Amino acid sequence: MRHLPADMVPYWDLQFSEGSSEPRDSSAAAAAVCGILEMCSNGGLEKEEQSFYRNEAQRMLESLIDKYAVTSSQEANGLLRHGVYAKSSPYNSVSDRGVDECNLWGDYFYLEALTRNMKEWKTYW
């Protein structure tokens, strides 16, 4: 959480922090919201910790809704803009593909996060 920028949506790599010009990864934020909410529902956290993490997940989800969600089918071919899945760095050999676009897992976790936010989630696993 310490590496997240003010809008709570991480850069494509958590080594970057506030003020970086690197692209954001909305799909990582959507997956993180689901993971945080799952962690909070499984026990093991003190009430204060659980409240903190639920609030952080809520802030992250609100940012996705307000700043990253597609608002028109004319705008994009998915639900959540600004996802990343292949970004080059000194530590890998990939080409920049899938930077700043919608992706399948971002859309899936975004829908799951919205569902978890609206009602008690009953896992199907």
Map each language-model feature to its residues:
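Glycan-recognition and catalytic cores of secretory/periplasmic carbohydrate-active enzymes
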Residues: 1-125
